[in-house]
């Protein structure tokens, strides 16, 4: 594994073997609007391993329209997509349903107005999450337990091959059994914490043998 640093953004080159030859997937960490613009200005669409976009505290806000331009630059994500501190991000639609994220894991952290997660309702793409599925300090996220989003949001997930964590989601959850009605397997930690309007958690017998921590 070889780490390559530039003055614009951090790139991690990860080799992999496919069809008898060695290729490389880059991982990118983009800090702030200027680094995002520099990245999306590139003309080569590529498959990446990990993609992280951060809006540092106190920095210039990153407009949602600029975030969605990632779709012009990234064809597929095979590792983890991380969205952190994005003050203007409201939706996953137009992002994870355009970039091929069917083999990815996801981290959404400290995105105060993120609400629409309905792109995850595509069962063909997202019934299995190939890594972590973490939503942390995104209070406006609408789950499948909200009346207006029943059978939408990320309610179609059946398996998470990493950690599954929901932390500090404060939207209404009128039908808790609808959050993960089909969930059968979590390979990592399963944590529900600080979801103040989720008064109980259940999806029948499915969670009986899962490592669930409900706080």
Question: Can you describe what each PLM-predicted range is?
Answer:
Residues 36-39, 67, 152:
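Disulfide-braced loops of extracellular cysteine-rich modules
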Residues 1-29:
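Bacterial Sec-dependent N-terminal signal peptides
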Residues 183:
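ATP-binding pocket architecture of kinase catalytic cores
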Residues 26-33, 49-62, 77-88, 96-113, ...:
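Concave beta-strand-loop units of leucine-rich repeat
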